[in-house]
């Protein structure tokens, strides 16, 4: 698998990000959706990666700089044709390694509290993320859980 920084202009990547946003609208009430659209993902504080198997998009993920010591994982998504093949593990490992290179002391994330998000929570737990209070601009939300990992 090849993981590369992506400018979010390719058809497959745009489609996967839009699919991610649409799925969030099906699983979460509007006030609890924290997924970012293409324009926000192109912001200077965010690095977005796409993961490829040959010419087929396998998944994506992003790292948002909250401050010089703290990063946030955003937009983790696996293409439907690559589910349960270890794509998310590889993308997450790549993001963690990049956060360490940047000198971040902590990496945090927000994900859903509903059953449909259980695979994501289990993945993050397996990498040593622990549940925490809301961080950055997040507030308490019964549809969200917050996790963090010291680097």
UniProtKB/Swiss-Prot annotation:
InterPro entries: Acyl_CoA_acyltransferase, Bact_Acetyltransf, GNAT_dom. PROSITE patterns: GNAT. It is an enzyme of class 2 (transferase). One of its GO terms (molecular function) is acyltransferase activity, transferring groups other than amino-acyl groups. Pfam families: Acetyltransf_1. Residues 3-151 form the N-acetyltransferase domain. It comes from the Bacteria. Its EC number is 2.3.1.-. Keywords: Acyltransferase, Transferase. Belongs to the acetyltransferase family. This is Uncharacterized N-acetyltransferase YsnE. The gene is ysnE.
């Amino acid at each position: 698998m090849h993981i590369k920084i992506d400018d979010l202009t390719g058809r497959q990547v745009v489609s996967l990000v839009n699919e991610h946003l649409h799925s969030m609208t099906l699983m979460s009430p509007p006030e609890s959706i924290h997924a970012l659209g293409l324009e926000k993902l192109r912001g200077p504080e965010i690095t977005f990666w796409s993961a490829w198997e040959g010419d087929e998009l396998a998944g994506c993920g992003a790292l948002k700089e909250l401050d010089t010591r703290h990063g946030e994982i955003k937009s983790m998504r696996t293409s439907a044709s690559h589910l349960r093949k270890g794509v998310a593990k590889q993308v997450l490992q790549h993001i963690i390694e990049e956060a360490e290179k940047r000198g971040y002391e902590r990496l945090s994330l927000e994900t859903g509290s509903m059953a449909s998000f259980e695979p994501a929570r289990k993945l993050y737990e397996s990498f040593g993320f622990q549940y925490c209070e809301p961080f950055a601009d997040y507030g308490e939300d019964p549809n969200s859980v917050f996790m963090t990992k010291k680097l």
